């Protein structure tokens, strides 16, 4: 499903203003850092907990708007901190995600989670399900503005922290990591939804992944990169994805 933006000047100006507002709100949550509490309120028994993975140069604080919305809807939520500003290897972060889920399974006594991977956090989660068998503990995976074709915006990171950060090299479109990630197959039975902002300058619109239904689970809405976690229409797509009954699952044809 793709929703194109209106071409009128007034509509375009409104989109720009909302995107700037979302960026400012995102920055306020960024400075909250990683010392934030997960919400263990669980008023909808039987629903999987939601695990949120932040993006490059992000913190757990950036996931708090989504965490609050899920908590308000009765879901137990956990924000996942994968390294200082996500500078290290994405493969190492994916391994840590698997270990984090294992610990939560033992602590909470639950078998499966719904996972939201924002931006680079989506690449981490996708690698975990494709190569580290994380799908055994993940019921559904939402990739929120994840650059699954890579992004040349990573060159900014290469120029600034490239000497100490493997991850900025791995997110480039020409990287072996991106090539392997696209070539790997999604595990059978795992439903994945890709959600993108039409005006996202950091993550240009990628191709649908093989195994993702391009009509049902490839969603494009007006907004920029920060809008993905700040704007309610994007949250509605996450909620509908996680709330859909399991018997709605259907075989998906290859998208590539």
Predicted regions located by residue number:
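Flexible, membrane-associating and regulatory peripheral segments of lipid-active enzymes
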Residues: 1-52, 57-59, 63-73, 78-80, ...
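Short, proline-enriched alpha-helix->beta-strand connector loops that line the catalytic pocket
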Residues: 47-48, 186-192, 213-216
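Serine-dependent carboxylesterase/thioesterase catalytic core
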Residues: 50-56, 61, 73-186, 206
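Short glycine-rich catalytic loops that host catalytic nucleophiles or stabilize transition states
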Residues: 80-83, 218-224, 230
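Conserved strand-to-loop "acid loop" that flanks and positions the catalytic carboxylate
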Residues: 193-200, 222-223
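Conserved alpha/beta-hydrolase "acid-adjacent" motif
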Residues: 201-207
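Short loop/helix-cap segments at secondary-structure boundaries that form the rim of catalytic
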Residues: 207-213
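Post-His helix in hydrolase/transferase enzymes
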Residues: 229-242
């Amino acid at each position: 499903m793709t929703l194109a933006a209106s071409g009128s000047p007034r509509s375009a100006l409104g989109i720009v203003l909302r995107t700037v507002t979302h960026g400012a709100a995102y920055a306020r949550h960024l400075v909250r850092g990683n010392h934030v509490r997960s919400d263990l309120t669980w008023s909808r028994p039987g629903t999987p907990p939601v695990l949120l993975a932040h993006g490059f140069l992000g913190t757990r604080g950036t996931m708090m708007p989504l965490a609050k919305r899920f908590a308000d809807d009765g879901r137990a939520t956990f924000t996942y901190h994968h390294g200082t500003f996500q500078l290290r290897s994405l493969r190492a972060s994916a391994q840590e995600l698997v270990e984090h889920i294992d610990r939560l399974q033992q602590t909470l006594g639950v078998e499966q989670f719904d996972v939201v991977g924002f931006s680079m956090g989506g690449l981490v989660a996708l690698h975990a399900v494709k190569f580290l068998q994380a799908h055994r503990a993940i019921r559904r995976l939402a990739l929120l503005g994840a650059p699954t074709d890579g992004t040349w915006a990573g060159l900014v990171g290469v120029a600034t922290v490239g000497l100490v950060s493997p991850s900025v090299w791995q997110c480039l479109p020409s990287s072996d990591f991106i090539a392997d990630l696209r070539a790997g197959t999604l595990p059978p039975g795992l439903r994945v939804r890709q959600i993108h902002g039409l005006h996202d300058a950091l993550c240009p619109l990628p191709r649908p992944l093989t195994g993702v239904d391009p009509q049902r689970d490839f969603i494009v809405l007006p907004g920029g990169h920060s809008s993905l976690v700040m704007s309610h229409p994007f949250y509605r797509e996450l909620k509908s994805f996680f709330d859909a009954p399991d018997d709605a699952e259907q075989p998906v044809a290859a998208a590539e």
